[in-house]
Amino acid sequence: MARELWLTHPRNFGPGSRTCRKCGNHHGIIRKYDLNMCRRCFRTDAEAIGFNKYR
C-alpha cells in the first residue's frame, strides 16, 4: 500500500527535484555554473569539462 504512493507527489523544488545529468543521483549536486552534476561525476569529468586542479 505505502509503496504505491512512493514518489508520486511531483518534486518541483528541493533536493529531490534535481538530479545529476550523468548518473541521476540526488545527493551532492553541484549547481554552480549550471553543471547539475553530483560531486562524484564531477571529479571524474572535471578535466574534460575544462576545470584545472592547482594542487
Curated annotation (Swiss-Prot):
InterPro entries: Ribosomal_uS14, Ribosomal_uS14_CS, RIbosomal_uS14_euk_arc, Ribosomal_uS14_sf. GO terms for cellular component: cytosolic small ribosomal subunit; extracellular matrix. It comes from the Eukaryota. Transmembrane segments: none annotated. GO terms for biological process: cytoplasmic translation. Binds 1 zinc ion per subunit. GO terms for molecular function: structural constituent of ribosome; zinc ion binding. Belongs to the universal ribosomal protein uS14 family. This is Small ribosomal subunit protein uS14. It comes from Dictyostelium discoideum. The gene is rps29.
